[in-house]
């Protein structure tokens, strides 16, 4: 039904947003620190 399809689409979008958010956080952490070393002391 249309309702089920709508909820499926919303769920998929929610997962995509959550995944993107997690990826962005991971990327930021990688930028801010290299192997646990603060960016200020990294090369």
Swiss-Prot record:
Gene Ontology cellular-component annotations: extracellular region; S-layer; spore wall
Key word Repeat present: yes
The species this protein was found in: Bacillus thuringiensis subsp. konkukian
Protein name from the UniProt record: S-layer protein 1
Superkingdom: Bacteria
Keyword field: Cell wall, Repeat, S-layer, Secreted
Lineage: Bacteria, Bacillati, Bacillota, Bacilli, Bacillales
Physiological role: The S-layer is a paracrystalline mono-layered assembly of proteins which coat the surface of bacteria.
Compartments where found: Secreted, Cell wall, S-layer
